[in-house]
Amino acid sequence: MSSPALKLYLCEKDRILFENIKETFASSRIKVVYEDALVLIPSFQVLSPFKVIANLPYNISSPVIISLLTVCHTLPVKMVLMLQKEVAQRLVAESGDSNRGWLTAFLELMSKPKILTYVSKYDFTPVPEVESAVLVIDEIVLPEDLDRKLAVRILKTAFAGKRKKIKNSVFNYFKISAEKADEIATHCKIDLNDRAEDLKKEQWLCLIKYFKDNKII
C-alpha cells in the first residue's frame, strides 16, 4: 500500500486466523473483519474503485464471484483469485467449448478472465486432493444498460439445458412464439440451432438488451 489513501480490508471466518491476522497486521489503514465473505459482500458498499485478492474456500468460490459482480453497487476493478484448477479452466473457456457454463458467459459480458498460473497441490500443507490455479479477472466494466439480474436469469436458463438448442432452452422455455423467436434471432444474429455454449459476448448482450427493452420476461 504505497499510497496513504489506500485502505486494506481483510476478511476471515476462522476465529484463530482472524485473531492472528488482527494482531500481525494492526494498522489504521488495515481493517480486519471476522465474517463470512458471502455475508460481508452485500453490506460492503464503497464508492471508490477497489480490488479483490482472495484465496477462496473452493466450495464457495463461484457464489463469491457471483455476489461481487451482482450485489456490489460499485464493481471491483480487478480480482485475483486462487481457485480449483477445473473451476478456473471452466471460467476462461471460449465460445464453442462444452466446458463453458453460465458463469463463464456472465464473466465474459463485463470482464476479461485469464489464468495467471497453476499451483501444485504439493505447495500446500496439508496436501489437498485438488490442483489449483490463480485466476485474474481484469478490465471489469459494466456494459451500458446491462441488467445484471436479467442477464443471470437468461444465462442460467440457457445453460440449464446444456445440450439443448437455444430455441428450446431459451425461447420455448419463456414461451416465445416461433415467429418472435425468428425476429429476435435475426436481430441478434443468432442461429436458433446453436447451443448456449456457442453464443458469443455480443450475441448475449444483444439478446439480454432485447428482452429488457421489449419486456419479454
PLM features: residue spans?
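Catalytic cores of RNA-modifying enzymes
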Residues: 1-153, 157, 217
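Surface-exposed charge patches
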Residues: 23, 168, 183
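Short, locally clustered residues in the helix-turn-helix/winged-helix DNA-binding domain
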Residues: 69, 171, 212
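An accessory alpha-helical subdomain
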Residues: 133, 137-139, 144-180, 188-191, ...
